[in-house]
Amino acid sequence: VSVLSADQFRSIVNEKGTAAQKALLGTANTNWQDVIYQTAHMTDNNLSIGGEVAKLPYRISLGFQTQSGVLKTDKLQRTSVALSLNPTFFNNHLKVDLSLKGSLQKSRFANLGAIGAAVSFDPTQPVYATVNPQRFGGYFEWLDRNSPTGLMNLAGRNPLGMLEQRYDEGTPQRSIGNIQFDYKFHFLPELRANLNLGYDVSKGEGTVYVSDSSAIGYVVGGKGGTNNIYKQTKQNTLLEFYLNYVKDLRFLKSRVDVMAGYSYNNYLTTNYNYASYTASGEKYPNTDPAFPFDKPENTLISFFGRANYAVNNRYFLTAT
């Protein structure tokens, strides 16, 4: 975002500002957006092995990824594994496709509030304090002697301090599985039965910690900051079954394709609710949740059918 440089900002304040406003100007030349952003780096390593053991085709994949965000302190580390099996039985009348995937991720999420703070913070001020550097983690902050906290209440907070003094760390986990059976009947090879079962389960949990000595977590007399936990689980299950009959009627130069099936899909989310705690682990008053969790759930059930009739591969009649 285009903003005024420190010299441009000083020039405008010196030209049009009051004496009190001029007195607040600093001597630094800080580009706060340069301070909070960085060049993002990523490594992505994958290993795949495939083959056949006792007539069982298989494929195994392993992955490891690390990535830093363009916003400082934003980063993730992910480990993943995938397995695929594709056996056939009964002289290829029954085909089975099994697929399993899993991932484990460790992330630190940056404080997005620093983006807006970097756009609006005074570019004439330094990143680190030169007066009372032992306070508020050593970051420059706007001070007010008349404020109980020593901080100027309406002023913005140091963008870099907002990033480096907030630890939002989580460990998302996810598992996806699918197995499909496709059976061609021996006594009626034109008829196939297909059963598809699948799931997608994920869990995210973590902590948000803000030091009680940081400007964004400071209160009078200490006992401030944040030390909260969060957790959410999601579960998606699928069952789908259909019969498909396909027959070429050569004497009529036509083809019949009929399918009928059933589908069940369930979505369940569990959000866990917790009280809020200070950085030292003391519970904030009146923060106990009314309910320990809530579980929104949706279920989709479908019956479906389709019939296609083709003549001479030129004329088509379809009903669904």
Short names for language-model regions:
Residues 1-28, 70-74, 80-176, 194-302:
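Surface-exposed loop/interface segments of Gram-negative outer-membrane beta-barrel transport/assembly proteins
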Residues 29-40:
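Periplasmic N-terminal accessory/gating domains of Gram-negative outer-membrane beta-barrel systems
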Residues 36-37, 44-66, 70, 82-88, ...:
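Predominantly transmembrane beta-strands of Gram-negative outer membrane beta-barrel pores used
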Residues 41, 295-299, 307:
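Short secondary-structure boundary/capping elements
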Residues 47-51, 83-87, 177-183, 241-245, ...:
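Residues on the lipid-exposed face of transmembrane beta-strands in outer-membrane beta-barrel proteins
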Residues 196, 261, 304-312, 316-320:
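Exposed, low-structure sequence patches enriched in small/polar residues
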